[in-house]
Amino acid sequence: MIDYIITLLASVIAILFVLVPHEYAHAFAAYKNGDWTAKLTGRLTLNPVKHFDLVGFLLCAFTGFGWAKPVPINPNNFRKYKKGLFTTAVAGVITNYIISFICYPIALIIFRYVIQMNIEYLMDHKALLYLAKFLYYVPMQIYAFGLTIFVFNLLPLNPLDGFRVVEALTSPFNRVRIFLQRYGSYILIGLIVESYICSMIQQFAGVDAIQYFNILGFYVQTVAKNIIGYPIHGFWDWIFGLF
């Protein structure tokens, strides 16, 4: 029970550390490109209350991917339209990647030099053990959530950041862009629902094979762990291996 509470608290903190800077980065990039909309509406801030979205928060907590309240942006205010659209779209995920890069070694340090080196002492002092676990779970969850949000948001489906990238790189008359703009949100909802159903079947019915039918979950976990996350843990594992 205590382990569950620790994990839950760590997850809540991790979600805030991932989603709030993500939205702030969008607002900051838009502001730097000439659009003051986010600043004038009070969204150029790290105050989590300003960015809170209940549905996105709950989805992130239960499925591992979600969103905060979208930052209001008016691309017509950008000094250079396509550049502004592109940099604003990718600002959030780049911020998440940087945060994940920073948090992974913090988690490693806590695990190796606090938990592993003092495991016998911690086992005799449960309160300190739970504290050490919490201090480890927080940066590790931030690392994992950050990569998940990175991969999830780069899906080229309206209204995700990936679709904004498509908008920045294609003509308004591009057929693929028009299709994604019109049906992207429906595809996204379908993927989320399908992923949730598969997760519930796997968890409560014990059907592990269903994970291979979880399209969104399989995509996010595979890309986040084996592609996007590989440079981070590969680099830091190499650095720590030198000592």
Question: Where are the model-predicted features located?
Answer:
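Hydrophobic transmembrane alpha-helices and their immediate loop junctions
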Residues: 1-243
